[in-house]
Amino acid sequence: MSKGYSNLFTGTSGERVIKCQEIKTFQGGRSREEYSALARDPARGKKVDYKGKKERAIVLELERQGLIGRVIRDPQADKGADFIDTTTGQKWDIKSPVSHPKGHHSVRKGAFNVEKIMVNIKKEISRGHNVILDTRRLTSKDRLALQNAIKDEKLNDKIIWYDKKGAKK
């Protein structure tokens, strides 16, 4: 991890945490075409959409903070990851669970289910992918349940947490 970041600190559990800030212009020295390509997911027809832009913003922030190396989109559409760290070859998939889809607070289809998200996480890890968990749309209760499940399965070394407070490995 790079030294010299004024926003690097040790969390209450001893984990390394980097405060994230919205960086809309950081492109990591990429051309316009390369920057655009980061938002084009082959699994979604290589169209630039909201989800692709969100994923691009997340990986560029993690790259900028030194948590991952320079990334490209994984060109494999079927069973591919979202991104490949070109410095290590590690593939990364982003998961963005939501506690209450569409702002509803009642239990409904698509609502957070720790067992379901763990199945998805373990599937990615079994493929050799590490996982970036975007937990900005989880309640603190659901986030804690997910943290405990990850810890119980001993998957911490395969996860980067991305939330409102920062990113941490």
Where are these regions (language model features)?
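Catalytic toxin/effector domains delivered as secreted proteins or via bacterial secretion systems
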Residues: 2-169
